[in-house]
């Protein structure tokens, strides 16, 4: 049987047009396994994002503060190409890369206006999973 042609099977990838946003929001989601940094405009449309896995860390190294630092730097550099200079930071989750990611946003040249913790806390909602016994 002859191999099927892949013509038209792939998606067309085009570069996003350059936005001109001066003030944005940096959303840092830091879990026990990974850190994801998204930089959005004030309406919530994503300008740039990066995660520890996307930057090149795999497995348990994704959960380190250094991986969070590298992810925040990568997201900040891409956001600066779109004109972002100031950010308000929203941190979510209990992970180890929270403070490191905020510091690296400042180190790359973004001016941090405010920092808010938006970790969701249940008002006694769902029953949590049973405790791990190792």
Swiss-Prot record:
Kindly give the PROSITE patterns that the UniProt entry links to this protein: RIBOSOMAL_S11
Q: Which residues form a coiled coil?
A: none
From which organism does this entry originate? Thermobifida fusca (strain YX)
What are the GO MF terms of this UniProt record?
rRNA binding; structural constituent of ribosome
Q: Does the keyword RNA-binding apply?
A: yes
Q: Which gene encodes it?
A: rpsK
Extract the NCBIfam families matched here: PRK05309.1, uS11_bact
Q: Which PANTHER family is this protein grouped with?
A: 40S RIBOSOMAL PROTEIN S14/30S RIBOSOMAL PROTEIN S11
Annotated stretches, region: Disordered? 1-21
Q: What is this protein called?
A: Small ribosomal subunit protein uS11
What do the Gene Ontology cellular component annotations say?
ribonucleoprotein complex; ribosome
Record has rRNA-binding as a keyword: yes
InterPro entries, A to Z:
Ribosomal_uS11, Ribosomal_uS11_bac-type, Ribosomal_uS11_CS, Ribosomal_uS11_sf
Regions of compositional bias (Basic residues) in chain numbering = 9-21
Q: Which UniProt keywords apply?
A: Ribonucleoprotein, Ribosomal protein, RNA-binding, rRNA-binding
Family, per the entry? Belongs to the universal ribosomal protein uS11 family.
Give a short account of what the protein does: Located on the platform of the 30S subunit, it bridges several disparate RNA helices of the 16S rRNA. Forms part of the Shine-Dalgarno cleft in the 70S ribosome.
How this chain assembles, per its entry, is: Part of the 30S ribosomal subunit. Interacts with proteins S7 and S18. Binds to IF-3.
Domain of life here?
Bacteria
* Gene Ontology annotations of biological process type: translation
Ranges that cross the membrane: none
């Amino acid at each position: 049987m002859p191999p099927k042609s892949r013509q038209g099977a792939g998606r067309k990838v085009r570069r996003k047009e350059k936005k001109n946003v001066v003030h944005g929001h940096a959303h840092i989601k830091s879990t026990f396994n990974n850190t994801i940094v998204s930089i959005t405009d004030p309406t919530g449309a994503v300008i740039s994002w990066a995660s520890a896995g996307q930057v090149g860390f795999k497995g348990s190294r994704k959960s380190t503060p250094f991986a969070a630092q590298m992810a925040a730097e990568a997201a900040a550099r891409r956001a600066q190409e779109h004109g972002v200079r100031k950010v308000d930071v929203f941190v979510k989750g209990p992970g180890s890369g929270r403070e490191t990611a905020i510091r690296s946003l400042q180190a790359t040249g973004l001016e941090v206006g405010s920092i808010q913790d938006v970790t969701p806390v249940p008002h006694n909602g769902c029953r949590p999973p049973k405790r791990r016994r190792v």
